[in-house]
């Protein structure tokens, strides 16, 4: 049950964050600065280090284009 609660809580702030955030893609400077954390932030709504939570980063599958 805790897992489902966690999912529900992380969904609400994600929607709020996306409303305030402009819909433009990140600039090259931002990509170089933050690198991989963009996808991680979208998935878990928090910045993570690769070495801290590597399996969770692997589990992220970006939607097919």
Curated annotation (Swiss-Prot):
InterPro entries, per database record: Poxvirus_F8
Any one Pfam family match given in the protein's UniProt record, by short name: Orthopox_F8
Region of interest (Disordered), ranges: 1-29
Induction text: Expressed in the early phase of the viral replicative cycle.
Keywords of the record: Early protein
Bias (Basic residues) ranges: 1-10
Stretches with biased composition (Basic and acidic residues): 11-21
Family statement: Belongs to the orthopoxvirus OPG052 family.
Protein name, per record: Protein OPG052
Source organism per UniProt: Variola virus (isolate Human/India/Ind3/1967)
Gene name, Swiss-Prot/TrEMBL: OPG052
